Amino acid sequence: MSPQTETKASVGFKAGVKDYRLTYYTPEYETLDTDILAAFRVTPQPGVPPEEAGAAVAAESSTGTWTSVWTDGLTSLDRYKGRCYNIEPVAGEENQYICYVAYPLDLFEEGSVTNMFTSIVGNVFGFKALRALRLEDLRIPVAYVKTFQGPPHGIQVERDKLNKYGRPLLGCTIKPKLGLSAKNYGRACYECLRGGLDFTKDDENVNSQPFMRWRDRFLFCAEAIYKSQAETGEIKGHYLNATAGTCEEMIKRAVFARELGVPIVMHDYLTGGFTANTSLSQYCRDNGLLLHIHRAMHAVIDRQKNHGMHFRVLAKALRLSGGDHIHSGTVVGKLEGERDITLGFVDLLRDDYTEKDRSRGIFFTQSWVSTPGVLPVASGGIHVWHMPALTEIFGDDSVLQFGGGTLGHPWGNAPGAVANRVALEACVQARNEGRDLAREGNTIIREAAKWSPELAAACEVWKEIKFEFPAMDTI
């Protein structure tokens, strides 16, 4: 017998395939405060027991592979393996289970969302023994949270920078999203900002196309910001989209924005990637720029109920990677978002501490310790009639963004902005006076419209517009 064979025998190596559950299903395991905990919605293939499916998820997203390997004997699997420690059937669903998996913290590189996701939502999602797999939630331990910078500035610092308190912030996405020249684009920004909005925004598609190169857009938008600030006496901003084909080009655009003295830049964090996003976030913190985050591509990942990843996980990942704003759905507009579920991950974005609450889709209690909060952005198919509901649902720490609801005003961009600002101020005043926005919302808007012809015109245009489809994202 060769020395190598003797060595393998001495560590108890036995070639072949064995059930995952023999190693990775550990219902007796007591989770540690330092474990990353994951809740997976697992749909096994017919004939695969839930214990084997849950153990397979734990194995394939940590130390396991399809067969025994002799190098297992060179390390401590008990220290590094993921463990499926609990399985619950999903009410009302046949052959679907919530499998809870605990991962030791040593499996992950410090300060890297990229590395965390490569393991937890990596190849396991293509595993043949599973019909479908969805990551519903993650518990990020405090020990891991503290390895991240998080948002560049956070909610309070942003309010101090802008000198705006006691109300939601107002924004507008410039439309048409593609095709305008840089000068016309800047003019549209100026009209919206002078009318009363706090921000205007590049659409997520706007990078540096032939019809409008990024440098020209940045210059004309900066002119719009400074001109509107001089006229209104308020601090204004435009989300200059720095997303680019390379990290180097992205940072170059952010540097130019800083040189122009504008307050905020923007990034498409899913299409751009978490490595790029974290790099940009760190640059923004070091150089005093706010960072607006768009979630383009999220519905490819989170829309299906039984496969992919819930947006609350993407929201937590963004808070780690860094961003001061992120789009979160509206509940009342044209884009997906059920109220309790949406408010669940909005709290995960803003609050220091969020209790487990399955009725809102929150599977784990989450502490963010001193990580700054992120402002949720409500955007997509909203207009002045939605203002009471938006104010009541999202509260002051939010950004309400009206694209078509500003630019579609029959009198132009500036009157559209005036209408939104008047509607918002009326709703905030009514709320502060103790009125019920949910019940009296339409009355509040009508009363304000008597004193604002711009608001009255907006009310008339959008009085019949509704987006009433059932939400896909339900418990």
From Swiss-Prot:
It catalyses: 2 (2R)-3-phosphoglycerate + 2 H(+) = D-ribulose 1,5-bisphosphate + CO2 + H2O; D-ribulose 1,5-bisphosphate + O2 = 2-phosphoglycolate + (2R)-3-phosphoglycerate + 2 H(+). The record marks K334 as: Transition state stabilizer. InterPro entries: RuBisCO (IPR033966), RuBisCo_large_chain_AS (IPR020878), RuBisCO_lsu_C (IPR000685), RuBisCO_lsu_C_sf (IPR036376), RuBisCO_lsu_fd_N (IPR017443), RuBisCO_lsu_N_sf (IPR036422), RuBisCO_lsuI (IPR020888). Keywords: Acetylation, Calvin cycle, Carbon dioxide fixation, Chloroplast, Disulfide bond, Lyase, Magnesium, Metal-binding, Methylation, Monooxygenase, Oxidoreductase, Photorespiration, Photosynthesis, Plastid. One of its GO terms (biological process) is reductive pentose-phosphate cycle. SUPFAM superfamilies: RuBisCo, C-terminal domain, RuBisCO, large subunit, small (N-terminal) domain. Substrate binds at N123, T173, K177, R295, H327, S379. GO terms for cellular component: chloroplast. Binds 1 Mg(2+) ion per subunit. The modification N-acetylproline is found at P3. Its EC number is 4.1.1.39. The modification N6,N6,N6-trimethyllysine is found at K14. The keyword Transmembrane helix does not apply. Its main location: plastid. It comes from the Eukaryota. The basic functional RuBisCO is composed of a large chain homodimer in a 'head-to-tail' conformation. In form I RuBisCO this homodimer is arranged in a barrel-like tetramer with the small subunits forming a tetrameric 'cap' on each end of the 'barrel'. Heterohexadecamer of 8 large chains and 8 small chains; disulfide-linked. The disulfide link is formed within the large subunit homodimers. Belongs to the RuBisCO large chain family. Type I subfamily. This is Ribulose bisphosphate carboxylase large chain. It comes from Amaranthus tricolor (Joseph's coat). The lineage of its organism: Eukaryota, Viridiplantae, Streptophyta, Embryophyta, Tracheophyta.
